Swiss-Prot record:
It is a multi-pass membrane protein. This is Protein-cysteine N-palmitoyltransferase Rasp. GO terms for molecular function: acyltransferase activity; palmitoyltransferase activity; protein-cysteine S-palmitoyltransferase activity. It comes from Drosophila melanogaster (Fruit fly). The active site is at H381.
Length: 500
């Protein structure tokens, strides 16, 4: 039993307590982070840049500690004309010659890269893209993975190549490394899909189709990863929804503005880099809120970047993955993987996990497949200690969640809880137990977002700060869990209503 059978079984008072605790903790935690703003500016290891010239931001300094967000801003400044060119070219092609859509993708991307990149960067990207088309002709999956291992090794070596970094500059270095990392996934998706395709479907895997996929500019550098199956299923003749497209782009722009405004007052990105700033909070209990908001700002970054790519993809007739789901609505870690980055989840599930085991495979085979999947996640994200810790914690949390769900699905467990606790009591017990999985899963993300130092600090605070602190943390996490369950039940109910 994992869901509330009927939301009306809970009293209004109980629901009020759950949401009251949730909202109060978030509001107070955010206020305490806001209260540290001047202390952080004074104690920071480097000086923040001047804020926007517009009042009242002109009186503040802006937190520029998040390299990914700053690099994205630099990318947009350099490449915004090519987003407009992409829209214009695709609008004309979809109107007059829909069959030339992929040539339009190739032309815009080739122009954008050739104008902005050094020749050495161009050689790297061209070689990577070409290598996957060549290996797909050999129809051997192990060669695809061998090639991918080689490129991932190359990317890790390039990250430490001072000569090349000095030659192209830091901005281009980041752009090329990130683009190559995404291109490895796109190359894998195309090659593995082609190898597994039926003979009559091979017309969908032509060179032009592949280059259009590999060089789709709106998702080239900042994602999301769109599987080749999705790309090949695009609807070239479909009427473009210009209003929906403008709305999608504006949504990303508005969230970017909201985040930039917030960074004049909430120095959460710097807090993720300097544990001393988190230590300045009133107590260990409120330090947990810093971890929560690190996750929320991380989520907003992907709402902006993925949202922009998804808006363009949908406009071009590509059935793109959904936008990231807010982490405040995710209470099982498996859902974090499924719904935060649907494109990456599809890639990992289809090309690694499902290739190693099936529904009827043994538990050992499934755990082994999960471990190998996270081994790939580790090397693809970069072979850093904090990524290794994050990957291991991800694996352990998902394995524990699988054991937990298997146990609570047993008829004996369900009969016992129903007999002694009733439907709602059984759900409360379920939530209390699941909270013990939710806490380490939530803190594991801090390793990926902020690094090992802040991850270790918050994890120690959760488990080594006394019984009272842990009980308070469990109670708040229990309320968070119940709120997410209530929202999910309501969302599922709406989906069923729409279906009927």
């Amino acid at each position: 039993m994992s869901r509330l059978p009927d939301r009306s079984l809970l009293t209004r008072c109980e629901i009020f307590v759950y949401f009251g605790v949730y909202i109060a903790y978030i509001v107070v935690g955010l206020y305490k982070i806001y209260g540290l703003r001047d202390h952080i500016v004074k104690e920071a290891k480097f000086q923040f840049p001047e804020g926007w010239s517009l009042y009242p931001f002109s009186q503040r300094r802006r937190d520029d500690s998040n390299d990914e967000l700053e690099n994205f801003g630099d990318f947009i400044v350099s490449f915004w004309p090519f987003y407009l060119l992409h829209v214009a070219v695709q609008g004309f092609i979809r109107w007059k010659r829909p069959r030339l859509q992929c040539l339009g993708f190739i032309g815009v991307c080739a122009l954008a890269l050739s104008v902005n990149l050094d020749w050495s960067s161009m050689v790297l990207l061209v070689t990577l893209i070409a290598s996957y088309y060549i290996v797909s002709l050999l129809s051997l999956k192990f060669l695809v993975w061998l090639l991918s291992a080689g490129w991932i090794l190359c990317i890790n070596v390039m990250q430490k190549n001072v000569w090349w970094t000095d030659r192209v500059g830091y901005t281009e270095y980041v752009l090329v490394i990130v683009t190559m990392s995404w291109s490895v996934l796109r190359g894998c998706s195309y090659s593995l899909s082609k190898i597994g395709a039926k003979q009559e479907d091979l017309t969908r895997y032509s060179l032009v189709q592949y280059l259009g996929y590999a060089m789709y500019f709106p998702c080239l550098t900042y994602g999301p990863i769109i599987s080749y199956q999705r790309f090949a299923a695009r609807r070239e003749d479909e009427v473009q929804n210009w209003l929906g497209f403008v709305g999608g782009v504006l949504r990303s722009a508005i969230w970017w503005l909201v985040m930039q405004c917030a960074l004049h007052y909430f120095y959460i990105h710097y807090m993720s880099r300097d544990v001393r700033m988190v230590e300045m909070m009133d107590s260990v209990f409120w330090q947990h809120s810093a971890g929560y908001f690190m996750g929320q700002f991380f989520f907003l970054y992907y709402v902006v970047t993925y949202g922009l790519g998804i808006a363009f993809a949908v406009q071009d007739g590509i059935p793109a993955p959904n936008r990231p789901r807010c982490i405040g609505r995710i209470h099982f870690y498996s859902d974090m993987w499924k719904y935060f980055d649907e494109g990456l989840y599809e890639f990992l599930f289809q090309n690694i996990y499902a290739e190693l085991c099936g529904k009827r495979s043994s538990a050992a085979a499934k755990f082994g497949a999960t471990a190998l999947t996270f081994a790939f996640v580790f090397v693809w994200h970069g072979c850093y200690t904090y990524v290794l810790i994050w990957s291991i914690l991800n694996f352990l949390c998902l394995a524990a969640e699988k054991v937990f769900k298997t146990f609570t699905a047993m008829p004996e467990y369900q009969r016992w809880t129903q007999r002694h606790l009733g439907a709602v009591g059984a759900q409360r017990l379920y939530a209390m137990l699941a909270t013990q999985l939710f806490i380490p899963a939530a803190f594991s993300n801090v390793y990926f977002i902020g690094g090992q130092e802040i991850g270790d600090f918050l994890m120690r605070g959760a488990y080594l700060s006394g019984v009272g602190n842990y009980v308070a943390l469990c109670f708040c996490s229990y309320c968070f869990f119940q709120c997410s369950e209530l929202l999910l039940t309501k969302s599922d109910g709406r989906s069923k209503t729409k279906t009927f």
